[in-house]
Amino acid sequence: MIRTSVRRVVVNSNKFDVRSISNSSIRFNVPNNQRTPPPAVRPPTSPIIVTEGGPKGGSQKQKKKFSFAGFLFKTAFWASVVYGGTLFVATKNDKVMDFIMDKQPPYYEELLNVIEHGSIEDLKRQLRDTQHKISNFDFKLPSKAKIDEFTHELESRGENLIEETKRKLGTSTGAKPRQAIPEGNSAPTPAEQLQKPVETIHKTVDHLPLIQLDKGIASSVDSSIKSTIKSFNDLILSIDAGSQSGNESLMREITENVSKLSSKLNKLTSSFDEELSSKLKISQSELLSSYTKKELELTENLLHQFHHEKAQMEKKLGSRLDQEIEATKQTISQAAVNAVSMMRVEQTKNFEKLIKGKIDQERDGRLANLDKLNSRITELENFSTSLESQLVANHQKSLIQQSLTKLKSLLLGASSEQEKPRLISPYVDNLAKVSHESKDELIALALQDLQPLLSRESTQSILSTPQLLTRWEQLVPELRSASLLPPNAGLLGHLSSMLFSKLLFPVKGAKPDGKDIESVIGRVESSLARGELDVAVEEAANLKGWSRKLADDWVKEGRKKLEIEFLMKIIDAESKIL
């Protein structure tokens, strides 16, 4: 099918630009500066060859034309790329986002929403919707009446074009007016005119462009169209040559070609309509048969699925019904068993209540003093229990006191040198065993500290207060000499300290404010004489230097005795309040 449309005819002074544009077939491709022979020379009678592309002759390279549509497309494309890139950067940069919010370009909110929240699934869904709309679009071919109307309009425009060309041709061939002679110059004489050189005037004539076919469709165009194009080109050349004799024959040839083209177009349209109607009928019958076949297949599949699902649902419903019946049976049987059990329990309670009432009635009648006797027996039982607990506690206390007395006699009693030493740990273990039954926490804690102190001690290893006093008196000369030693003393210092220590006078009594060695010795001796071992040990522990080093063993023995006495006092006091 060939679709042809004539847009417009533009006449500008002596230049005719006839543009007959086809959607896919005919275009002008001859530049405006094409030069043809001058008007006085007739054009050659040889046929004009229409080339498939480029200028006439095909020897010169065609200059690429400026495309306004391409320029608009490229500008819109790059502007869209820059705009979209700016919005994408705005989602990553706060400064660009602030700039976008201040300027508020068009559709920026929708585009930002698409960039931030859009996904491939949304694009696929929109593409499917677009395809669905395109597939549902009802495209209709032009009818025969519209084609006839378009053909008639094409013929009328062709005739108008020819008449306008003839009219313009008559006005363009007129002589140019002479130039006026300036008033200031006089007319030249014949002799002067003969002496002037001969001037050659070159006249430039603008020619009409020829009609050419596109390169891709030149081979597939019908011969009638080619003959029509050739007739138009001959007319254009004759117009450029200024010959008036061949215009009538060319007009007749053009009219015949246009009539042939119109008749051929009518035949083609009628054949196209017939072929289209036949193919539509065939397609309709095939589509109806395929729809019927598909409907039968779908009906059969649906019936098969319906029967299959029905069987499965009946099977599931039957199994579920059996399970519910079995569960209901079990529930009913269990409820019956529970009801029977409850009845038995109620009957048993009622029977017990009846028996109890009878017994209480009999007791109130014959055994009225039984409650008083029971209360007195309970009081007697409580008294005997308390008495027994007191006896046990007293016995426990007596055992603890006996063990503690034996331990005190061994530790604090005076032991002779002829007496054989005995270990104290068995007595401590006996005390722990006896006091364990009392379950007193304080006694247990005291025994935990006392057992490590006396685990390796005997009756001779624990020093008494007189023994500690004797050892202190033996230690006094060494303390005096050590107090007189200078710092970093040598042999001479030791000898001089021993010598001068003999000259010191002993101090008797207690001197609370004295800090010299004699005052300390006097306070320790007086404290030991009064039995204040803790005060004496504290005084000895406050010594400094070599004196403290010499008295270290004595201090340890004194502290051990003090710890033993303190722990034994705690056990004795706690055992008395059991």
UniProtKB/Swiss-Prot annotation:
It comes from the Eukaryota. Component of the MICOS complex, a large protein complex of the mitochondrial inner membrane that plays crucial roles in the maintenance of crista junctions, inner membrane architecture, and formation of contact sites to the outer membrane. Plays a role in keeping cristae membranes connected to the inner boundary membrane. Also promotes protein import via the mitochondrial intermembrane space assembly (MIA) pathway. It comes from Debaryomyces hansenii (strain ATCC 36239 / CBS 767 / BCRC 21394 / JCM 1990 / NBRC 0083 / IGC 2968) (Yeast). Residues 29-68 are mitochondrial matrix. This is MICOS complex subunit MIC60. It is a single-pass membrane protein. Residues 169-191 are annotated as: Disordered. Residues 1-28 form a transit peptide.
